[in-house]
Amino acid sequence: SRGLGDVYKRQITESLKRCNVLKINDEELITIGRLFGYPGLDIENKCWLILGKYNLDMLVLTCGVNGSYVFAPGVKSFQETPKVEVADTVGAGDSFTGTFCASILKGKSIQEAHELAVKVSAYVCTQNGAMPQIPEEYTL
C-alpha cells in the first residue's frame, strides 16, 4: 500500500506539471524538498531545481522576516524584508502575491513587481486587519 507521502508527492507533481508560476513559502519548500528527495540543498538550489525540472516560467518564494526571492530562467531577484513596526501580519502574504501578480500583468519587470510586492506587504503588516486601505503610492 502507498503511504500518505506518496499521495502528496503524486498530487504535487501533477500540479507542478500544470503550472507555469509557483508561489510557495520557505516551510512549503522544506516539505517539497523532503518529499522529492533533496532536503540537503540550500534554498536557491532547490528553487532552481524545481524551476528547471517543471519548466516553470517563475518561482516566487517568501521567507517571512528572511526576505523573498523570485526565480525565472536567467533571473534571480532577492528582496530583504523591511523592518517595520508590526501591528498585524494577517493579509501580508496575500497582499504580496496579489501585488506581485497584478504588477507582472501590468507589464512591470520582475524586479519592479518584487520591490512593490515587498513594500505593500510590509505596509499591510503595520496596519490592523487583513484589508487596510493601500496608500496611493503603492497602487498600480
Regions found by a protein language model. Give the residues of each.
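Short, glycine/polar-rich helix-capping loops at beta-to-alpha or helix-loop-helix junctions
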Residues: 9-13
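A short beta-strand/loop micro-motif in the catalytic core of glycosyltransferases
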Residues: 19-26
